[in-house]
């Protein structure tokens, strides 16, 4: 089992953990419907960047 050679100071420990924070997912609002969706993904109504790109069950 690995054993550290020197104790890591609280400052260095904090620097090591500085990139471990969780980020909120990037969301966007569809301009035509006003729905919130993940960026670079189709909205639940089938719109992407203001254009209808996918037929949904509601359309049929």
UniProtKB/Swiss-Prot annotation:
Task: Specify the superkingdom.
Answer: Bacteria
Gene Ontology terms: biological process? translation
- Cellular component terms (Gene Ontology): large ribosomal subunit
Query: What residue spans carry the region label Disordered?
Result: 1-46
Stretches with biased composition (Basic residues): 9-19
MF terms from GO for this chain are: structural constituent of ribosome
* Coiled-coil intervals: none
Which Pfam families does the UniProt entry name for this protein? Ribosomal_L32p
Cross-referenced PANTHER family? 50S RIBOSOMAL PROTEIN L32, LARGE RIBOSOMAL SUBUNIT PROTEIN BL32
Of which family is this protein a member? Belongs to the bacterial ribosomal protein bL32 family.
* NCBIfam families, alphabetized: rpmF_bact
This protein is called Large ribosomal subunit protein bL32
């Amino acid at each position: 089992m690995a054993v550290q050679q020197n104790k890591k100071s609280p400052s260095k420990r904090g620097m090591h953990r500085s990139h471990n924070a969780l980020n909120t997912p990037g969301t966007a609002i569809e301009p035509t419907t006003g729905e919130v969706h993940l960026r670079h993904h189709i909205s639940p109504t089938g719109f992407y960047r203001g254009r209808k790109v996918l037929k949904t069950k509601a359309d049929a």
